[in-house]
Every structure is written in structure tokens, then in C-alpha cells.
A protein has these predicted regions:
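Conserved alpha-helical substructure of the radical SAM core
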Residues: 1-62
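Alpha-helix termination/capping residues and helix-transition junctions
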Residues: 6-9, 60, 135, 248, ...
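N-terminal pre-triad scaffold of radical SAM enzymes
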Residues: 7, 12-17, 199-203, 207, ...
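Flexible loop residues that form catalytic
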Residues: 20, 48, 71, 146, ...
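Residue-level signal for the nucleotide or nucleotide-sugar donor/cofactor binding architecture
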Residues: 26, 85, 249
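Radical SAM enzyme [4Fe-4S]-AdoMet core and its adjacent flexible, acidic
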Residues: 60-65, 69-71, 76-210, 214-224
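Flexible mid-to-C-terminal extensions adjoining Fe-S/redox cofactors in radical SAM and related proteins
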Residues: 214-310
Length: 310
């Protein structure tokens, strides 16, 4: 509670609760209510399993956005990742939150184990089913296009490129214009993108503070029990600017720097997210002319999709 209060007092506006599963913490209802009372905009990332009808009724008012993990298109494929008997419960929770008026999204990360020749059709059927049950209310569907490392598993760039192509085909099967819409949705009007988000504060369950939500790959900059929130907020701003496209090589001289924002500071930079053990200047190491040309084409195609000219 004190951390949230201090965050707000130092200019904080948005907070995301994740885990694990936030509802595993018994005082979560009091925490989300307190965040709402402070005027913070709250997002919750949940696996969807612990929500009762009463909890949804009691807490929906305090939640600005909720995202559920659903890593398959049905019970069979979801159980390969999340365990058996969970799929219908999560779908039901998704529908109830959307119908309660909360901005609701469904995040899906397929694995090679549960992808098959029928995934495109079955995923579209799932999307259509949820839309039908939510009476036209906006539910946002997100497909992860990158396999992140974890549990001693690491993926090569070539593997992720292959995976991304498969996922984009699934998206296109659901909505042939998805790539255009995703591009423009990721670029807010009149907002200059200078960073991937490095510098945003992530507080782990033990109070350690990181400046990216991929905390297992980052360094801690201290603990909220030992340093004031003002310190972390100032340090986060400092890191955000130091690693912005205006200050890294070769991005600072690229005409596309405010469109691509430089990419991930863990995956695409020489310091791999490890600020404290790295020295200036920082370098983007994954960009090339082929990627630039693809980005230019995607930008132009998206623009032409939304704006028609005689």
C-alpha cells in the first residue's frame, strides 16, 4: 500500500499487477481498491482460474484493463501448457469481465507442441465464440510473436523468425488486415517513440526493483524497503533517456528511429539489459538494411490501408 501511495505522490499514473497470479495474494482486493482510490489506472495480468462471480462483481470497478493468458485454442491444446481442466473456466472468466464493462484482452503464446495444421481455423473459432458471448463488446486478442527464454530454454533468432511467420499467418487468417491494424495500434498519434519501455518500474514480490518486466534477465537496482520510490522513478527516467534512440548507436542517425524505437534493449542491444555492468555508448546490434526496408514497406502499406487517395 505504501509503495503505491509513494508511487502516486511521485507522479505515477499507471500500475500493472502480475505474478504468478495476483489473486494468490490474499490481500489483493484491498490493494487494487487502494490503487483505484489513489487515482491510478490499474491493469491486471491473470491466468483466470481464481475469479469467482463475486470477486468479478466486487473488483471490476477498480480494474481499468485485464489480460488473461489462454495458451491454446481448446481444452486439449491449452492443457499442454496450462494443465488440464482450465480452458472453459478461463473462457468463462474472460466473457464475464468483458460483459462487466472492463477492457479485456486475451494473450496467447503458442508453443511448437500445440501448433498444428488446424490451429488457424480453431483459433478463429475461439475468437468468434468469445465475441459471440460478449455481445459485440471489444475484446482484444494478442498473439505473442516471440518465444522468450525461460526454464533453461533459449531460442535462436532463426527459430523466433520462423515462429513469428507462423503466428502472423494465424493472425491473417482471423483478420487479413491484422498486420496493418497492429502497426497503427502500436504507434500513438503525436507520440514520439524513443524506447521500448526500458526504465519502467517492475517490483518483484520480494520488493526488488527492476527497470523491465522481464525481471529474470535484468539486474535489480535495489529494494523498496531500503530506498524511496522517488529514487527509483528518477533512476528509471535516467535509464529510459540514456538508452533512447536519440542516444544509442547507430539509431541516433537513423531516419526510422522514432518509428521502430530501437527494438528490445535485452534482445537487440550489446548490453542485453544489463545497464549497471555496461559502458557508454550503447549499441543496437540486430538492425540491418533488410529490416529497415521491411519496416518502411509495412509503414507505407499500413498508411495506404487506412487512408485512401484519388
Amino acid at each position: 500500500m505504501k509503495v503505491l501511495t509513494s508511487f502516486k505522490e511521485n507522479g505515477g499514473e499507471f500500475v500493472t499487477f502480475s505474478g504468478g497470479e495476483p489473486l494468490m495474494f490474499k490481500n489483493f482486493p484491498q490493494i487494487i481498491s487502494h490503487a483505484h482510490d489513489l487515482g491510478l489506472k490499474s491493469t491486471v495480468l491473470s491466468n483466470g482460474l481464481l475469479w469467482s462471480g463475486k470477486l468479478i462483481h466486487d473488483l471490476a470497478l477498480f480494474i481499468d484493463e485485464i489480460q488473461f493468458s489462454l495458451d491454446g485454442v481448446d481444452e486439449e491444446t491449452n492443457s499442454m501448457v496450462r494443465g488440464s481442466g482450465h480452458f472453459e473456466k478461463v473462457v468463462d472468466t474472460i466473457v464475464k469481465f468483458a460483459n462487466a464493462g472492463v477492457k479485456t484482452s486475451v494473450a496467447t503464446t503458442f508453443t511448437y507442441d500445440n501448433l498444428n495444421e488446424n490451429t488457424q481455423t480453431r483459433y478463429k473459432n475461439l475468437v468468434d465464440l468469445i465475441k459471440e458471448k460478449t455481445s459485440g463488446k471489444d475484446v482484444f486478442f494478442k498473439l505473442s510473436k516471440k518465444l522468450l527464454p525461460g526454464r533453461d530454454v533459449h531460442f535462436k533468432a532463426e527459430e523466433n523468425e520462423k515462429y513469428s511467420a507462423i503466428i502472423k499467418d494465424i493472425e491473417k487468417h482471423v483478420d487479413e488486415n491484422a498486420d496493418y491494424e497492429n502497426f497503427l495500434a502500436g504507434h500513438t498519434a503525436n507520440l514520439v517513440a524513443i524506447n521500448c519501455g526500458l526504465g519502467g518500474i517492475s517490483v518483484s514480490s520480494d520488493g526488488n526493483v527492476y527497470f523491465c518486466n522481464r525481471i529474470n534477465e535484468m539486474e535489480s537496482f535495489g529494494n523498496v524497503t531500503e530506498k524511496p520510490m522517488s529514487f527509483f522513478m528518477e533512476k528509471g527516467k535516467e535509464i529510459h533517456l540514456a538508452t533512447s534512440v536519440e542516444n544509442v548507436i547507430p539509431c541516433k542517425d537513423c531516419e526510422l528511429r522514432y518509428i521502430c524505437d530501437g527494438g528490445c534493449r535485452i534482445d537487440d542491444f550489446d548490453f542485453a539489459g544489463k545497464i549497471q555492468s555496461s559502458a557508454l555508448p550503447y549499441h543496437q546490434i540486430s538492425c540491418n538494411d533488410e529490416k529497415k526496408n521491411k519496416l518502411k514497406k509495412r509503414m507505407i502499406d499500413s498508411f495506404n490501408y487506412f487512408y485512401k487517395f484519388d
